Amino acid sequence: MLYPELFRAFERVRWDLERDIQWGAFDPNRLSEEQAQTIKMNAITEWAALPATEMFLRDNRHDSDFSAFMSIWFYEEQKHSLVLMEYLRRFRPDLLPSEEELHAVRFEFDPAPALETLMLHFCGEIRLNHWYRCAAEWHTEPVIRQIYETIAKDEARHGGAYLRYMKKALVTTGDAARNAFAKIGVLMASARRTSQALHPTNLHVNQALFPNDTVQSRTPEAGWLERWLDQQIRFDAVWEGRVAERILHNLSLLFDQTFSSVQELNRYRKSLAA
């Protein structure tokens, strides 16, 4: 069981909303309207940890260890939404998301294979870590830069915890886990080949609600994410390459193989079905 160890490890590095964020360093002259608007949209997006947690608990009733870890993940992800909202409450209260705007991103996700979802969210944590690090470089106001740097580290730790559960799944389910992880790994490491931002909040998850069945489609400004990535923080091919490299590196360690490209991972995936 991983939950007790992960709980203690996460407790040791948990940051405090009041004490650890340097609220007094705020510089109003270094926050643009454009930047402030994106903070609101990320606060709403992070609120989608709520329906994601409901999905995880529903689809992992067979796994109480992982379900218990969700109590940690949910707490920390909701705190990401909260710290962004606290920033707006203090410095741009006119942009604070309404309860209705937050509730709009809570909807039911269709059931999906638990191992594929685990891998999808592992890759999502890697991607979000890089998005937030890139956002911290784009922002000019020191407090929001610190916030993005702080929550980026959380996302990296979450990815590390998911990797622990992936290792456990290899022991308990063997090839089923290998197939699931390789399949989703090929998809999520191939983002340079698609214009779509490959993150769980930007994927269709409820067929009955299509096309209004991504988290991003239910935000006040659908399409903001692509603009944020492409035109604002400029998450370019260099950053995207770093995401793919981290996914391939971790799968190399997980499978005791060497994947230097998506093509090599895809060949491995095909070999599993042979």
Tell where the protein language model's regions lie, with residue ranges.
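Non-heme di-metal
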Residues: 1-274
